[in-house]
């Protein structure tokens, strides 16, 4: 997927960060990279991405409608570009940039 179709914060955690950071964890758990100020403004995704529920919709946005039809959709798999325990929908959408076909 073209990177300009998705916007992701530099820390990759989207709005709110990790729940562990809300309980006073270190900067890693708050989703801050070393040296990043704690008072930064919240990250906002581009309009229209919040309603996407699966990878085929993301692929359709990327101009590949044929992947969303028939058995081809069953062969589409996405792998995260980095190892992270975040379950944020924004983060997941940002990680669906590495799409492979089996």
Curated annotation (Swiss-Prot):
Tissue: Ubiquitous.
Protein name per Swiss-Prot or TrEMBL: Putative peripheral benzodiazepine receptor-related protein
GO cellular component terms listed in the entry, alphabetical order: mitochondrion
Lineage top rank: taxon: Eukaryota
């Amino acid at each position: 997927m073209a990177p300009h179709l998705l916007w992701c914060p530099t820390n990759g955690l989207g709005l709110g960060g990790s729940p562990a950071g809300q309980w006073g964890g270190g900067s890693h758990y708050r989703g801050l990279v070393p040296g990043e100020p704690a008072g930064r403004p919240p990250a906002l995704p581009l309009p229209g991405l919040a309603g996407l529920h699966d990878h085929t919709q993301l692929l359709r946005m990327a101009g590949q409608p044929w992947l969303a039809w028939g058995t081809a959709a069953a062969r589409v798999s996405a792998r995260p570009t980095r190892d992270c325990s975040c379950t944020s929908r924004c983060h997941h959408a940002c990680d669906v940039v590495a799409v492979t076909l089996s």
